[in-house]
Amino acid sequence: MLHSGAITSTKLERESGIATEIMEQAGLQAGDTLLLSSNSGINTVPVEAALYAKEKGVFVVCITSMQATEQLKSRHKSGKRLCDVCDVVIDNHAPLGDGLLTIPGYGQVTGGASTFGSLYIAQRIVLNIENRYLKDGLRPPVLASANVPGGDEFNLQLVQTYQDRIKALR
């Protein structure tokens, strides 16, 4: 939602009903796994996304800051936070306010800890899944760089295989 701008994004992530629209477009199916990331874990959209996915039989994993979420009240009508509705909760250890540095003399924080922590965690999950494929004697379905010889051809095969399930590939 950040593509709409920071102020609009903040308003949208607190509105009910948006998550349902997004999740319906995703085409989730029972047995899928959904990874959600929300540093505070208190806004309506991520909580609704998790609840929607669970109703569909999807396994839901979230990355959140337990330090932040434990100090804040949910904005979801149920009063639940993201960590309350997910199957697995991974703590990104970001501090309340999400800043790594305090601006001297002003008290504001900067350097989004959740950006660094959550991206690292998500990439580790991907690497672990790829290793699981390899241990099972399978080739992980990973796109090649389009800027290396044969990359486009290899990627076309993967796109054709997965485009019905992953709309972003269409």
Predicted regions located by residue number:
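Glycine-rich phosphate-binding loops that contact phosphosugars or nucleotide phosphates
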Residues: 1-126
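YjeF_N-associated NAD(P)HX repair module
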Residues: 104-170
